[in-house]
Amino acid sequence: MLRFALSRIVMAIPTLLIVAVSVFVLIRLIPGDPAQLLLGDLATPASIADLRARLGLDKTWFEQFAIWFGHVLQGDLGMSITSGQSVAGLVFERFLVSAQIVLAAVLLASLVAVPAGMIAAWKQNRWPDLVLVGTATLLVSIPTFWLGLLLLLFLGLELHWLPVVGYVSIADDWKAGLLYLAMPILTLFLHEIGVLIRMARASALEVLRLDYVTHARAKGLSERTVLMNHVFRNAFGPTWTLIGLVLGNLLGGIAVVETVFTIPGLGRLLVDAIFARDYPVIQGCLLFVAAVYVLVNLVIDLFYPLFDPRVAAE
């Protein structure tokens, strides 16, 4: 297991390096000069040149990357051009906000979707299967931002059950914090539950067709025993992998939900930084998300043998 973990970590290093180079190059292809943007249209060429020199933008791309990546290896993501704050501190602070939403949504979706998918497979082509698959397909087809707006309109503006927009830290007031996070969590939950139900159903159907399941039924075992002892564990492996991918994808794509509900999370920070041409923050956000994505997949790979004995044997 240790060798497997070390091999995965070694494989992640070139991935992160490629991400770092790609992020560095792509954001510099975005039109606009950060120095000009900060100083405004009335700035003189001399003041713009001076600010570019202080920000290191007058150097070649290779020199800029070497300096930036050298600092990254020391845990220093630089300073924000617009706010002057430490990028590492800013990114981590906003990440904690986003992580609350993503983890809660994925956990709730998994707890509901996996049993629902198993039931749909067990009752294939009967009304429970048709209802669950139809609901899952509908939820997947609705764009996240539109789903968020519908919830905001219905639960917030019409029924007044939940706060419409804003954020309160759970550390300051856990009751108010949960109320403000409820709609963002519900939005992601409803969208991702459809994906997980379909995956769990497909995995369970594949396992139900295998010979050892037929043999277990022929031995007279109850359907409950067959499903729990022979189907669930073997069908959960692919779903477990998908849960990890969903977790990583949500963290990288949560900007839409955070924008709709004005949540000060990592996605909102990235969007604001892009509009402000804040290179250090953009680079820090994207590199951090990539690192978390790689870490999540590493954890998924390490725990996968628990659900597939064949992988553990290998």
Where are these regions (language model features)?
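Short, membrane-interfacial amphipathic segments enriched in basic
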Residues: 1-2, 58, 62-63, 74-88, ...
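Short amphipathic alpha-helical coupling elements at transmembrane boundaries
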Residues: 3, 40, 50-53, 67, ...
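Hydrophobic alpha-helical transmembrane segments of membrane transport/permease proteins
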Residues: 15-66, 159-180
